[in-house]
Regions:
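Contiguous segments within soluble domain cores/interaction surfaces
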Residues: 37-188
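N-terminal secretory signal peptides that target proteins for export/translocation
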Residues: 1-12
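Bacterial signal peptide processing site
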Residues: 32-35
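Short active-site neighborhood of thiol/selenol oxidoreductases, capturing the structured segment around
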Residues: 206-227
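C-terminal motif of bacterial Sec signal peptides marking the signal peptidase cleavage site
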Residues: 27-30
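Thioredoxin-like thiol-disulfide oxidoreductase module
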Residues: 256-284, 289-293, 314-315
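Non-catalytic, surface beta->alpha helical segment in thiol-disulfide oxidoreductase systems
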Residues: 292-321
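Typically the conserved alpha-helix immediately C-terminal to a functionally engaged Cys/Sec
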Residues: 228-245
Length: 321
């Protein structure tokens, strides 16, 4: 697939905007507690349900979505919680519900739970939830929980659900990309910014992997230039899983930028890889698990724990959703 210069500039700007949003979430990890937490009474809005816990006395906090590529169908939605003093709020799990805001009657359509996942390189982390959206448009997530001092808290925010995701949809055919392999370059540094790259992650192209009758894990990440600082740890997890599933699954790492040796500390010099554009990736890291038949099994935007990826790989090996 060929892209015009205009397409490349547009895509690059979109990527940098999204990464800036995620970097904003990361910055909360460096904030210190400077003021005491205060309790407020949440006033129900026209979009709130009368019996919602949001109408009880709770501390209102902020929720920051870390997932950008949301569309109808199955989604892995992640978010951070930020307290009134701008420090990250960390508890084991929170309750979530989702409302479709474009309906004539606003009501809870999906209820669930989100569990906390610590990021490996900071005091921040995200909450991970699974949700199936059946309608595109404006949705609201409401988060309720109890902090480590036993106090109730509440947060809500609106977000857009698209009719079609930027990245390949679940159960759709993935692009048969011909990414550069170790055999195509003179030095591994041309296709990997990892400090200690696992050479086995660079033996296959996506096209090769689709044609060898094994499931495939593809991680798009740029360890050296990652704005959220989670790309290196994510690639390391994929490498560790490669060892566990040796001979059962293909594993591939692809850089976000195609000229990693030319950037030299100036991200303005970075050129988005055409394969990143082909896959519609607008954040980093991004991990995909592909079935033997070349259809997408699952996808993971942002940092994903080893356990979560292990479970998904185990399911695809055993033909489970």
């Amino acid at each position: 697939m060929k892209f015009s210069l205009h397409d490349i500039h547009q895509f690059r700007n979109k990527l940098l905007i999204v990464l800036s949003m995620l970097f904003f979430l990361l910055l909360f990890s460096s904030c210190k507690n400077n003021i005491e937490n205060s309790k407020i009474t949440s006033t129900p809005t026209a979009t709130s349900l009368k019996n919602s816990e949001s109408s009880t006395t709770s501390r209102r906090i902020n929720v920051v979505l870390a997932t950008i590529d949301l569309a109808i169908g199955r989604n892995r939605l992640t978010f951070g919680l930020v307290d009134s003093d701008q420090s990250p709020l960390r508890v084991d799990s929170v309750k979530t519900d989702y409302l479709f805001m474009d309906a004539s009657k606003i009501e809870v359509l999906v209820e669930g739970e989100a569990k906390y996942v610590q990021w490996p390189v900071s005091k921040s982390g995200v909450y991970v939830s699974r949700v199936n959206f059946d309608t595109p448009g404006t949705w609201m997530i409401r988060v309720k929980g109890i902090d480590n001092d036993g106090n109730n808290f509440f947060a809500e925010t609106r977000f857009a659900v698209k009719s079609k995701s930027f990245t390949p949809a679940i159960d759709s055919k993935v692009p048969q990309s011909q990414n550069k392999k170790l055999s195509d370059v003179e030095d591994i540094s041309e296709i990997s910014s990892s400090t200690d790259p696992d050479l086995k992650l660079y033996e296959l192209s996506i096209l090769d992997a689709i044609n060898n009758d094994l499931p495939t894990v593809v991680v798009f990440a740029t360890p050296k230039f990652c704005m959220t600082q989670t790309c290196g740890p994510q690639v390391a997890i994929v490498s560790k899983l490669r060892e566990k599933f040796e001979g059962q699954v293909n594993f591939i790492h692809i850089e976000i930028y195609e000229n990693i040796n030319d950037i030299d500390g100036d991200i303005e010099k970075a050129k988005i890889s055409p394969i990143v554009m082909e896959w519609g990736i607008v954040s980093e890291p991004f991990t995909f698990i592909i079935k033997r038949n070349g259809l997408l099994h699952s996808k993971f935007e942002g940092y994903t724990s080893e356990n979560e990826l292990f479970d998904a790989i185990d399911r695809v090996i055993n033909f489970k959703k």
